[in-house]
Every structure is written in C-alpha cells, then in structure tokens.
A protein has these predicted regions:
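Short acidic-glycine-tyrosine-enriched beta hairpin
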Residues: 95-123
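Beta-sandwich/jelly-roll carbohydrate-recognition scaffolds of carbohydrate-active enzymes
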Residues: 53-59, 81-82, 94, 109, ...
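Short, conserved beta-strand element in jelly-roll/cupin
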Residues: 77-93
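A short, N-terminal "cap"/entry segment at the start of jelly-roll beta-barrel domains
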Residues: 2-58
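Short histidine-centered beta-strand/loop micro-motifs
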Residues: 53-55, 71-78, 106, 125-127
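Active-site or metal-binding loop neighborhoods of secreted/extracellular toxin and effector enzymes
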Residues: 144-166
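Conserved short histidine dyad/triad with adjacent acidic residue
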Residues: 62-77, 118
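Ligand-binding loop in jelly-roll beta-barrel domains
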Residues: 117-144
Length: 166
C-alpha cells in the first residue's frame, strides 16, 4: 500500500463520527490560540509543538475549527509542510501549486486528506454548512508565512500590518 492510499484510509477512519468526536473532545482540553477570539479559527493542541514526543516524531498536531472563510485575504503559504484531515464540515479551497503555477478549486469534505508543501499557496473561500473541523499535522518550520499579492510574495507580518490583520 502506498503512502497516499494509507492516508486516504486513515482520513476516512478519523472522520467516523465516534472517532472524530473523541479527537475533538480530547483536543478541546488544550487550547493553543484562537484567531479573532475564535470567530475565524479555534486552535487546540493534540501533540504540542516542542514537546519531547513532538521532537522525537518530528511533527506537531493541532485541531482547527474553521469558523469563517479567508475572506478577501490573499492566498497564503505555510512555513512548514503539513497534512490536513477533514473531520467534520468542509470547505472549498483555492490552491496554487508552485510546480505548475495555476489555481485549482477543490471541495474538502469529511474523510478527505491532503498535503501541502511550503511553497504551495491556498485560500479557504467558502465553508460548507457551518464550521469545518480538521486535524492539522505539521513538521518542522522551514520558512515564514507568505501572502501572494500583485507585488509578489509578502511576509505575513508585513501583509497583515497593511491589510488589517486576520
């Protein structure tokens, strides 16, 4: 079985209501930080970045409850490679693949999983029927967050400062 097939089966398993509800209940005991007091996104730890186990495995795991789309914010990258598992809800995502340089619209529903590299840009532009709850598994930080603008890729601090923050 190849890696993507394994992750596909794992994603479907994690989205079973009893499994997803257990993960959510465990994660909600450990708040990481919320963006806009949770109006945009709630974030919780399952495997805290920097912990002994996280350093040993080379990953950290958070639960994200996405309560709002990215609005008019530009497409953005992340400073690490990550994999997301959709547990509940869902969304439409715009993706820019660095290798190909074109946009793709993708619907994400419970059971779906995908990986993003640090150079891939994305934007969540529509939620499906309420919040989307995801398991967010990421590796070591290798770069900064960037937002894609007509002036090129802008570091997130600069972009957020000039565009009203999150």
């Amino acid at each position: 079985m190849n890696k993507e097939t394994f992750y596909s089966y794992l994603g479907r398993f994690l989205a079973f209501p009893m499994v997803a509800d257990t993960i959510i209940k465990l994660a909600k005991r450990r708040v990481y930080s919320h963006i806009h007091n949770g109006a945009y996104m709630e974030r919780y730890w399952l495997l805290r970045e920097g912990s002994w186990l996280s350093r040993t495995l080379g990953i950290a795991i958070r639960l994200h409850v996405i309560n709002s789309n990215d609005g008019d914010r530009a497409m953005h990258t992340h400073p690490f490679k990550f994999r997301t598992f959709i547990l509940k809800g869902g969304y439409w995502e715009r993706r820019r693949y660095d290798d190909f340089g074109y946009d793709v619209g993708v619907e994400r529903v419970p059971g779906d999983t995908y990986e993003m590299d640090i150079k891939d840009a994305h934007q969540i532009y529509r939620l499906l029927d309420g919040p989307a709850t995801t398991l967010f598994v990421y590796g070591a930080r290798k770069d900064d967050w960037y937002f894609e603008t007509e002036h090129g890729m802008i570091p997130h601090e600069q972009y957020l400062k000039t565009n009203g923050g999150y």
